[in-house]
Amino acid sequence: GDVAKGKKTFVQKCAQCHTVENGGKHKVGPNLWGLFGRKTGQAEGYSYTDANKSKGIVWNNDTLMEYLENPKKYIPGTKMIFAGIKKKGERQDLVAYLKSATS
């Protein structure tokens, strides 16, 4: 994926609810620092739904690609109000950006 394009997508579609930097604060959604390799529902100090806490998968390229296509299908009961990104290329760019920005 293209990190620069992914950053644009993040700013347009994600940044109103999420921060990415180390020590960034939780907004409507959790701060995403340390996302890769972490289990669902584990950002410290954020109040998750039981659905997110009990999903039990680890965030990586594949799980994020699937989740970001249709969040409510992947984690029924999530409170993330986001329809998803249908275009595979756009998701690949976003995941590339998240990988670089959150670690």
UniProtKB/Swiss-Prot annotation:
It holds the Pfam family Cytochrom_C. The keyword Repressor does not apply. Heme c binds at C14, C17, H18, M80. The modification N-acetylglycine is found at G1. PROSITE patterns: CYTC. Binds 1 heme c group covalently per subunit. One of its GO terms (molecular function) is electron transfer activity. Electron carrier protein. The oxidized form of the cytochrome c heme group can accept an electron from the heme group of the cytochrome c1 subunit of cytochrome reductase. Cytochrome c then transfers this electron to the cytochrome oxidase complex, the final protein carrier in the mitochondrial electron-transport chain. This is Cytochrome c. It comes from Thunnus alalunga.
